[in-house]
């Protein structure tokens, strides 16, 4: 639910002013939150199922595929470090006018 609210807030800000000040950092915050949450959930899922969950033919479901897709998303969307740098750079540039603090 938190990510959905962040995405709606970003979309609203973008629709009101596509070249607005906080568009870049709001997008980075959404991406960072989604990447971190997905990684945590997939790691916990793999821990619950143990080594058996990582086999492709696991009878418990597609644990291996979801974990692999999560890692691919982590690389595709940009490492969380890049997102954190973007957020911190823009926070310093704009001062303390940010709505979100991670």
Residue ranges: model-predicted function:
Residues 1-102:
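Alpha-helical interface subdomain recognition
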């Amino acid at each position: 639910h938190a990510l959905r609210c962040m995405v709606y807030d970003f979309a609203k800000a973008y629709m009101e002013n596509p070249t607005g000040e906080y568009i870049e950092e709001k997008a980075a915050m959404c991406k960072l939150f989604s990447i971190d949450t997905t990684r945590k959930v997939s790691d916990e899922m793999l821990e619950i199922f143990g080594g058996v969950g990582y086999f492709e033919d696991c009878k418990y479901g597609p644990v291996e595929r979801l974990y692999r897709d999560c890692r691919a998303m982590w690389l595709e969307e940009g490492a969380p470090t890049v997102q954190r740098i973007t957020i911190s750079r823009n926070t310093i540039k704009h001062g303390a006018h940010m709505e979100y603090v991670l």
